[in-house]
Amino acid sequence: MRRRRRFAFALPLVIVVALVLALGVSTGSARSHRQTDAFKAAWIYVGPHDDHGWSQAHDKGRLYVQNALGSKVQTTYKELVPEGPQTCQVIESLVRDGNKIIFATSFGFQNCMVTEAKKHSDVFFEQATGTAQAKNLAEYFGAAEDAIYLSGMAAGAATKKGVLGYVVPFAIPEVIRHANAFALGAQVTHPGAKVRLIWTNSWLDPSKEKKAAQSLVAAGSDVLGQNVDSPATGQFAESKGVPWVGYDSDAHTFAPKQWLTAAVYNWGPYYLRRVKAAMDGTWKTGFYYGSLKDGFVGLARYGPKVTAKTKRMIAAKKAALLSGKFYEFAGPLHDQKGKLRVKKGQRLTVKQLYAMNWLVKGVIGSAKG
């Protein structure tokens, strides 16, 4: 059954997403212990909890909390929640149900999180990839750009033409810095490599992602990467014999021959700390930015096409990142048009990364989407 479900993934998901968008409703689900005295914690996902990507990585974090705390906590999730005003309705429902901490896992949920945090001072709110804080609203993310840079090295080592394709969702700073990191990593193992972008304007749309992958290969890309949520790019890559770098989760089963690696997140330990803090009264607002050092981000397993030499190069670069001797966004760095964006000796701060609106030299595409 599991094998059949994997290969049937793309079409049903397209149908479900289309229905959700057309009807203007969100799909809710829960997996929890039902003790009435248990502390209640909730997660909101933009995709299905089993998307084999972003939302599934968060749901693994939720399960980590549930398994660690057992009957002391009741965890709930809402999936396929549209970004926009409807998010507020979902949050209101979760508050009415007695949830005392709510994790919103997509940038487009932020406006409603800010609104609802003001209305419910007795509830703790946590916004992933966000830019807003309040007394009862915290933000959290991690330096995925470091892991993406390393995955880009694997991609660069796999290309023969020196042209890689990268399927990207929205032209926002988060995605732009990730695309830049991927390109800079690829240029280490394949100097002069070009990375061509195609924007889908959706976090999760397998049909658009597959079409983007097809277009990238047709335009000459011989390696594919992604910053979107489904494994559709990888399924296409496997069918065409094109090496593939995933994102968010280990999805090697969708492309066992062409899989290289992926930047992945380990949300569980952070979620556990925050739920415990909410339970014992020590929760405080703030900004958390996880790293390679604390294990929040990392690389998934390598596929068969990644050579021992490439693995050694990636390991050495990872060690340099961990020690602080290397940083991918240290100057000099030039943009697509040759303009110096980061001077020699300068290192971009997290604040500057959060405002990044330009693409590095070698990236083909527009930073405006």
Question: PLM features: what roles do these ranges have?
Answer:
Residues 31-369:
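A residue-level marker of the well-folded mature domains of exported/periplasmic proteins
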Residues 1-39, 367-369:
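Short, low-complexity disordered leader/linker segments with a strong preference
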